Amino acid sequence: PKEYDNIRIIVYSLPKPAEIKKTPDIIELSISSPDKLSFVKSLIGKEISYSDFTKTIDEFKLVDIRGVTKGKGTSGPVKRFGITLRQHKSEKGQRNPGSIGPWHPAHVTFRTPLAGQLGFFSRVDYNHKLITSGKISEKNINPSQGFKHYGKIISSYIIVKGSVQGPAKRPILLSYPLRPSKDQKKTKYEFQEILV
């Protein structure tokens, strides 16, 4: 097309090298490039790996991690919002809020802590420090019995400081830091070994 406002690409993962599952995950990505059309044409039919972006990520040594958290199902207001337990002699339950709001306006506001869905939320963790990355063929970091709930890493890996949202095999999306912090940039870590 000669005239276009924006170009976005649809990419899919290659689950076979990781041996986690059979069906690929599909995602739509936006592109930042002066000439988007020629950049997209150069990518069609090619595998995009993490190593293609290591030069630009090495400038920051930080990544933003997007993903869906672990699902906890329906849970009460104490676990969901952390409200305090009421006195043991209180009426109509200890693990409920004492009041769900005023008489008027005559509806319950969204701010009232009530039972409902907890977890399986889309979340972004900003400024995770990138410690190291590599391939298993170059350096084997697998524990003897593999990682808990995951197994052994077969292809490539990235080690990040801190915890990452979601269960072991759920896909996550790494992106450049939107608001990189200077303190996180300055801190330096050296990878020794993994203890499980």
Label the predicted regions:
Residues P1-T74, K79-V196:
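Extended basic (Lys/Arg/His-rich) segments that typically form rRNA-contacting surfaces
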